[in-house]
Curated annotation (Swiss-Prot):
The keyword DNA-binding does not apply. It comes from Actinobacillus pleuropneumoniae serotype 5b (strain L20). Residues 152-222 form the DRBM domain. Digests double-stranded RNA. Involved in the processing of primary rRNA transcript to yield the immediate precursors to the large and small rRNAs (23S and 16S). Processes some mRNAs, and tRNAs when they are encoded in the rRNA operon. Processes pre-crRNA and tracrRNA of type II CRISPR loci if present in the organism. Residues 3-125 form the RNase III domain. It catalyses: Endonucleolytic cleavage to 5'-phosphomonoester. This is Ribonuclease 3.
Amino acid sequence: MQLERLQKKLSYQFTNLDYLLQALTHRSAGAKNNERLEFLGDSILNFAIGKALFEKFPKANEGELSRMRATLVREQTLAILARQFGLGEYMRLGAGELKSGGYRRESILSDCVEAIIAAIYLDAGMDKAIEQVHLWYQDLLAEMKPGDAQKDPKTRLQEFLQGRKLPLPTYEVLDIKGEAHNQTFKVTCKIEMLEEIFIGIGTSRRKAEQNAAEQVLAKLTTK
């Protein structure tokens, strides 16, 4: 059975498979979808990773812990886990999402991972859900170190400019496309010391700004 293979990849056997099926169901495929599970799973994931970092780095300050957690729970990291599990093969998507390659989209994959975390919590309780998160993240957690590398691009760009007593960057939304639940933002980032205007794209304004800031940093550090 297909779900048996997935459960082996997840290293977890569900008592109630209905929880897993719901976690794999995108809103485009039906009314009983994974949106509520995603909401719950996001909270459990943040707590589980926060707990792991708190215990692993007793000398790290709040800012360092927050930045490391942000790196570990961001969409791109969750999508990497989803691909390791091969979630795209098992997800239930509506015809439109299937046609547009939704099973490859990072936002859909990451939401599914969060929904599965909530499904495990409902199936076996909080301790088991946290245990699974720690198991899935053990390699990533082993690589984490407090420090500047965990700061997001906007923070690093701001600190780069402040350290040189230069004006801060300005961000402006250039374009928003798509429906409310599936939007693409295009944002510009300008700094005084460069004539070029950098354009970032993302599924939220914040992500688009981070993308633009990353481009500016790349330009500044290769000058």
